[in-house]
Design a protein with these regions (language model features):
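Long extracytoplasmic/lumenal interhelical loops at the membrane interface
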Residues: 36-38, 276-347
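Hydrophobic transmembrane alpha-helices and their immediate junctions
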Residues: 203, 212-219, 242-250, 256-260, ...
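Alpha-helical transmembrane segments of multi-pass inner-membrane proteins
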Residues: 12, 127-156, 166-174, 180-232, ...
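A conserved mid-to-late transmembrane alpha helix and its immediate loop/hinge
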Residues: 180, 184-186, 226, 315, ...
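Transmembrane alpha-helical segments and their membrane-water interfaces
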Residues: 10-14, 53-64, 83-146, 358-361, ...
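N-terminal hydrophobic segments of proteins, predominantly signal-anchor/transmembrane helices
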Residues: 18-39, 48-110, 379-385, 425-426
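Transmembrane alpha-helices of multi-pass inner-membrane enzymes
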Residues: 56, 195-197, 242, 246, ...
Length: 426
């Protein structure tokens, strides 16, 4: 057990006790960074903090009546049932992992929704933290790419702060693949795609937030996140971002001067980055032209997933079976390149059904409370996570972004003032 990680956990736990709601918003925004870190005992940092936060929430703030208004109640129950039954009938039972899965994938979403629904001013804490983190991650991504080295990862690995001591040194599209402060480049890609989408929506729809956060800082953060997606050198991330950005296109608001500027920018971009863009386009049409995963490897992984799923088709083989047994026995399964592969093996048809119901309920929530165009946002992340794994990211946490957007759309003027003074961007 790393003493530095224990100290970080104790500090965060103390902040949760002193100022639960603000701290929970900051922790939620930083979940993918905390998810890379070692924590306490068998739990990673984000898992341990989430369990501590949920315990405090249940003791202080939980009311049974709140369950009735929760929009994801059915899919949450289905996910919990899937986890419990799969673990109970598994060959190897993991009760610690069962608790962390339920808390991180299901309970944390409920806590987040209750905090926002009862005082939507806490949204500003989340957004401000996202802007700060995006600026830090974006700037460091550029530094890492320019110097072709990641000194931060060397330091944290020497201190054994992260659960995986992976330093990505692959070359893709002629440049080192960036991972910034995350354990993997795909985690950086997932974070950058979601932050680009969320902050772009805020910049286009929330003038009060833009003024309070600072237009330049917000624009720089968005630009850095989009650039970071390309610097990861991950095709699935680029494809996911392309779909996410479709959420913001509307013929109704297109003006000829912007069309002209866009055309000129694209032409200049192709002229300046001709070789780089050629490599990206070629990588989609000829996956063997670059290193990394390809269609054959993914096909083998899905064939193996189907094979092991048939051992227990309805309930699956139990939590962590994919990475503790299958990946250990079959090298082709290392870093299972899809959201669906571990679900198929670990949780079977019940788990697949639970995730599909979750996606449908989130889609309905977007249609009812956000904008129907934002279904492309959901689809973009689904495409990305279906093509690649995203370490330190739980797909269900995508719901955070749509809760934020829904309440911003409904209460923007009354929630621009933050109920707390941290963390400051000025």
């Amino acid at each position: 057990m790393n003493i530095i990680c224990v100290f970080i956990f104790l500090i965060i736990s103390l902040l949760l006790i002193v100022n639960f709601k603000c701290t929970f918003m900051v922790v939620s925004a930083c979940s993918m960074v905390l998810g890379c870190m070692n924590g306490v005992g068998p739990f990673g940092m984000y898992q341990a903090v989430s369990i501590a936060a949920f315990s405090i929430f249940m003791l202080r703030y939980f009311y049974w009546k709140d369950m009735r208004t929760y929009p994801l109640l059915f899919s949450s129950i289905l996910l919990i049932v899937s986890y419990v039954l799969s673990n109970h009938y598994a060959v190897y039972r993991h009760y610690g992992s069962l608790v962390s899965c339920i808390v991180v994938d299901v309970a944390s979403l409920f806590v987040f929704y209750q905090i926002i629904s009862k005082n939507s001013r806490y949204i500003f804490i989340y957004i401000r933290t996202c802007v700060i983190l995006s600026l830090v991650v974006g700037v460091y991504t550029l530094v890492e790419t320019i110097i072709s080295s990641n000194h931060y990862m060397f330091i944290v690995n020497s201190l054994e702060l992260y659960s995986q001591d992976i330093i990505v040194e692959d070359i893709r599209f002629g440049m080192k693949r960036a991972q910034a402060i995350f354990g993997m480049h795909t985690t950086l890609g997932g974070f950058s795609t979601m932050m680009a989408g969320l902050l772009l929506w805020v910049s286009l729809n929330c003038p009060l937030y833009v003024k309070k956060l600072g237009k330049k800082k917000l624009s720089i953060a968005i630009g850095l996140m989009i650039i970071a997606v390309f610097l990861t050198g991950t095709r699935s991330t680029i494809a996911g971002l392309a779909v996410v950005l479709m959420s913001f296109f509307s013929f109704k608001h297109v003006k000829m001067k912007y069309v002209f500027i866009a055309i000129v920018s694209v032409v200049i971009g192709f002229m300046a980055l001709d070789a780089y863009l050629d490599k990206i386009i070629l990588s989609f049409t000829d996956m063997e032209s670059v290193g990394g995963s390809n269609t054959d490897m993914r096909s083998i992984q899905f064939e193996l997933a189907a094979l092991f799923m048939m051992q227990s088709p309805f309930l699956g083989n139990g939590i962590s079976y994919t990475f503790e047994y299958v990946a250990d026995k079959y090298k082709e399964m290392c870093g299972a390149e899809s959201l669906w592969i571990p679900i198929m093996i670990d949780f079977g048809m019940l788990g697949i059904t639970a995730i599909i119901v979750f996606i449908i309920q989130v889609g309905y929530y977007i249609k009812k409370y956000c904008e129907i165009r934002l279904l492309f946002f959901l689809l973009g992340i689904l495409v990305f996570n279906s093509l690649s794994s995203i370490p330190a990211f739980s797909f269900t946490q995508l719901f955070y972004l749509f809760v934020i957007i829904a309440f911003l759309k409904k209460h923007q003027e009354s929630i621009c003032d933050s109920p707390s003074s941290f963390p400051s961007i000025k």
